[in-house]
Structures are given as C-alpha cells and as structure tokens.
C-alpha cells in the first residue's frame, strides 16, 4: 500500500501518470467519449466523476507552465455549455495552486489532440462537454 494516494486512482492510472513526461497529455473524458476508436491507451474509471478524479490526481500532477495546460471541447454551433461543469473542474484543479485558464477548441480539434494523447481516462461523467485535456509540466 502507498500512503496519501487517493483510492480513486487505480494502479493503472498511477502507473500512467508516473510514465508521462513533460509535455505529454492525458484526457479525462465523459462516459460518452469515443476513446477506444481514437487510439491511445484507455483507462476505465467507471462510476467516478471527472472532478473527483481531478481532485485526486492534482496533488501528484504538475501542470505545464509553458503552454496552455488545460483544454476543453467547445460547444457545437447552436448548442450550449453548462458553466457548472467547467466551474467544478476549476475548483478541483485549484487545490494545489490557482487554476490556469482553460482553452476551448472545437470537437474535431479535440479529437485530434486525443489521438496524440498519452492516455484517455473514461469516467462515469455524464455532463455534456465534460472532457478535459491536461498537459503535464516539469516538477519544480
């Protein structure tokens, strides 16, 4: 057993977080994201919300300080975003330091980034546009 590591972080996720290098990206996706068809390693975190997982990993994960470290999917034209989703993620990511800005990109650009990601974590999140990309930084 390891101490101070949240039980929400599976052994597989812990290994992936440790293997990632600076500049590598990981997606925490909602339950409807097409992770398996995009290519990178997929980790299942069924039943967990994205915000709970973000809260669990942020003490272990340094965000990139040289490039925008947080990216979310923009709403498709004619659709709307629930601002509470981003607010929950910001709150979770603010536990260790102020949350950096979150950049929004269109759905297909997000899918392209996901194809190049180190891994995709599929959660039980049901919020629309509930996907977020994190870019790993250099530890101080």
Curated annotation (Swiss-Prot):
Gene3D superfamilies for this protein: RbsD-like domain
InterPro entries, per the entry: L-fucose_mutarotase (IPR023751), RbsD-like_sf (IPR023750), RbsD/FucU_mutarotase (IPR050443), RbsD_FucU (IPR007721)
Primary location recorded for the protein, binned into one broad class: cytoplasm
Record's signal peptide: none
Ribonucleoprotein as UniProt keyword: no
GO cellular component: cytoplasm
Disulfide links within the chain: none
Residues the entry annotates as binding substrate: 30, 107, 129-131
Key words, A-Z: Carbohydrate metabolism, Cytoplasm, Fucose metabolism, Isomerase
Active-site feature positions: 22 (proton donor)
GO BP terms, alphabetized: fucose metabolic process; fucosylation; L-fucose metabolic process
Record bears the keyword Isomerase: yes
Function: Involved in the anomeric conversion of L-fucose.
Family the UniProt entry places it in: Belongs to the RbsD / FucU family. FucU mutarotase subfamily.
NCBIfam families, A to Z: PRK15420.1
Protein name (record): L-fucose mutarotase
Gene name of this polypeptide: fucU
């Amino acid at each position: 057993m390891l101490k101070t590591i949240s039980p929400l972080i599976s052994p597989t996720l812990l290994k992936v977080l440790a293997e990632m290098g600076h500049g590598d990206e990981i997606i925490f996706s909602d339950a409807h994201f097409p992770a398996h068809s995009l290519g990178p390693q997929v980790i299942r975190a069924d039943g967990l919300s994205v915000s709970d997982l973000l809260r669990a990993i942020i003490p272990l994960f340094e965000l990139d300080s040289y490039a925008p470290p947080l990216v979310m999917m923009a709403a498709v034209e004619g659709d709307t975003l629930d601002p509470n989703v981003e607010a929950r993620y910001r709150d979770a990511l603010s536990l260790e330091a102020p949350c950096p800005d979150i950049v929004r990109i269109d759905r297909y650009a997000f899918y392209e980034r996901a194809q190049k990601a180190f891994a995709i974590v599929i959660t039980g999140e049901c919020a629309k546009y509930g996907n977020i990309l994190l870019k790993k930084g250099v530890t101080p």
